[in-house]
Amino acid sequence: MSKAIIVVDFAYKGTQRKGHGTGRKGLSSTLKYLQYRDKVQNRLAANRDYERWQDRGMGIHWRDIMKNSDALQSKHVLAWTWVISPAPDLMALIPEAERRDLVCDLTERIVEDYYLERGFGVPEYSYILHDREAKMEDEGETMQQLHTHVVLPGTAPLDGVDRAAVYNNKERGHDVLFREIASRHFSEALDRIVGPEWQLLREEPEIEPDQPAPNDLDAWFPRS
């Protein structure tokens, strides 16, 4: 199996608190962490007027997002939280000045297409871009890992009704759809910016069958 070109995942915060990290308290803690976790390096992050969140309807501050999550929750889901993380080795092929805009553009395309392909209208959402150093499994070196955290409501617009509950179930193939959409958009971006040669980083090495030594006649031509 070839290595993934982009990692995506979804999780949710339920409407009821059922332990540590769940319910409204769990969501508010997560939002605060996402908003302020790099404030040592980026002191503007603690400023109410600093737009760290990219607002597509849920707000530019954790309090706004919390308020909108309350208003747009479903019976069981207060908010969905996504992670979208393109592979660092492939992102390294992108000119540095273009990387952040690319990840933001990818995030918006993935959100929009996922909901449209599920039959919903595009819901309100907000996302935040994080930048960290990640250790690569194979090489042991660290590389820049740009990724986004997306917060979406428990409901979405649906034709014929005002809004409907959204559930993401692996058993129904929603995770496969999520990965396919993300991979499609990232591969198209790589083709456009880098060219098809990026695919060389994802080709599986050919495994040659063990062959006998050239002078081993018994192996090539077994004795009768």
Regions found by a protein language model. Give the residues of each.
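N-terminal nicking endonuclease/strand-transfer module with a His-rich metal-binding environment
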Residues: 1-224
